[in-house]
């Protein structure tokens, strides 16, 4: 979420406060041979083995990407509109404005012997989608002077790193910076960006080879990253923050970018010109109301009264829950038939993500017409064995939760209310923060 001087910000320390949130799910024998992953530490990093990389190099690579992604490849605050040299969250859409792939885009340093205009980029995407995205990219290549290549296994490694106790300024890293990476003393072969999908969510880094992340970070910089955790713990942390990732959660050619929170996550630049899928996205942003959004959910059994009030779910690795199949409909417990309240997207243990009708499953009011929400209303997901390929049917209750930053973004009208902010001043402030970070690193 982009902040302005008139908008309250949420620091990382507030997110890490202990929340007492009880569930009454029966603790039974494990329903699978794999135990739930442990809770994520306050500081740590994870190797994202479920992500793949595509290289795009050539003199036309920047203009080519500008016409395909939701993010702006140019620095709009500069009258010369130079090419952005920072990584960012973005998405590829189809012509109907639906998501093909959520992605991260990273610049690579200029290779020796190439012209200054010959930029190189890495696209990070769901590993199972690399072939499909590469096909999409080749379809739009036409006569553009560039090369496309899927990176080999082990050629580079994708990492997520976080420090829940870190200063809020890390979340203010500006996409218009001229720096390749917010990590000033990193090796020239390392690229990365701040992960803007939730306040204080952490950083994304790409390193060469398969070695440990800290081997690529010199001196004190490498000491503050904590210890490596497995992919499961990263997934838990991501779902606790309500961050969907990959096409098992952001369904290809079905999900809409605003319903997937890409506007709130700074993955869309509404000021940029034409790109594939822009029309529906811009029209919804300016004239429509986003009635559904992806939210974190708490899975439980028993009564709703056993759940204490909170704005984020609480993960308990000892709780075993049989998860519904992805895409299962959410309905009211009291209703046999009626309008679907949303769709379950995925989960780990007793937490998950769901696409929720806000005015039905939460107290968020989008218009002045009132809502269908009742604090006593319970919701469930029911499924049959035929849906998940098993011989058994199942049912689990869930409660949608609205993180504080999501509620604030919606109540403020999102970026529409912030259109009058001083973008030049914001860019200058971010550059000053980067310079301060570089000075601190060099003085250590």
From Swiss-Prot:
One of its GO terms (biological process) is iron-sulfur cluster assembly. GO terms for molecular function: transferase activity. Pfam families: Beta-barrel_CAF17_C. Its main location: mitochondrion. GO terms for cellular component: mitochondrial matrix. Residues 26-45 are annotated as: Disordered. Belongs to the GcvT family. CAF17/IBA57 subfamily. This is Iron-sulfur cluster assembly factor IBA57 homolog, mitochondrial. The gene is caf17.
């Amino acid at each position: 979420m982009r902040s302005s001087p008139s908008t309250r910000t949420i620091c990382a320390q507030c997110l890490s406060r202990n929340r007492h949130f009880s569930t009454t799910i029966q603790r039974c024998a494990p329903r699978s041979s794999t135990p739930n992953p442990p809770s994520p530490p306050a500081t740590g990093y994870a190797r994202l083995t479920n992500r793949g990389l595509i290289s795009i190099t050539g003199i036309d690579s920047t203009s080519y990407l500008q016409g395909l992604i939701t993010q702006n490849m140019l620095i709009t605050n500069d009258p010369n509109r130079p090419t952005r040299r920072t990584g960012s969250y973005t998405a590829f859409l189809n012509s109907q404005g639906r998501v093909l792939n959520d992605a991260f885009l990273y610049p690579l340093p200029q290779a020796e012997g190439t012209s200054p205009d010959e930029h190189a980029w890495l696209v990070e995407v769901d590993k199972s989608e690399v072939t499909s995205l590469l096909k999409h990219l080749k379809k739009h290549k036409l006569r553009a002077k560039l090369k496309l290549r899927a990176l080999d296994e082990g050629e580079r490694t994708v990492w997520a790193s976080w420090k829940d106790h870190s200063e809020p300024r890390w979340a203010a890293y500006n996409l218009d910076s001229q720096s390749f990476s917010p990590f000033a003393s990193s090796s020239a072969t390392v690229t990365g960006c701040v992960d803007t999908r939730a306040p204080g969510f952490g950083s994304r880094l790409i390193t060469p080879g398969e070695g440990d992340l800290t081997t690529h970070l010199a001196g004190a910089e490498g000491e503050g990253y904590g210890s490596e955790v497995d992919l499961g713990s990263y997934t838990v942390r991501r779902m606790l923050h309500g961050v969907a990732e990959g096409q098992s959660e952001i369904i290809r050619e079905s999900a809409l970018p605003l319903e997937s929170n890409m506007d709130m996550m700074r993955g869309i630049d509404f000021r940029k010109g034409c790109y594939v899928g822009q029309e529906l996205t811009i029209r919804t942003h300016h004239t429509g109301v986003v009635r559904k959004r992806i939210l974190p959910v708490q899975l439980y059994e028993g009564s709703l009264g056993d759940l204490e009030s909170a704005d984020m779910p609480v993960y308990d690795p000892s709780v075993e829950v049989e998860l519904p199949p992805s895409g299962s409909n959410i309905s009211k417990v009291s209703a046999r038939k009626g309008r679907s309240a949303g769709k379950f997207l995925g989960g780990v243990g007793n937490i998950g993500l769901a696409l929720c009708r806000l005015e039905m499953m939460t107290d968020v009011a989008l218009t002045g017409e009132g809502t269908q929400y009742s604090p006593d209303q319970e919701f469930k997901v029911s499924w049959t064995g035929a849906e998940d390929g098993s011989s058994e049917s199942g049912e689990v209750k869930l409660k949608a939760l609205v993180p504080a930053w999501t509620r604030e973004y919606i109540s403020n009208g999102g970026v529409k209310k912030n259109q009058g902010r001083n973008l030049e001043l914001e860019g200058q402030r971010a550059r000053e923060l980067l310079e301060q970070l570089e000075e601190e690193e060099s003085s250590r």
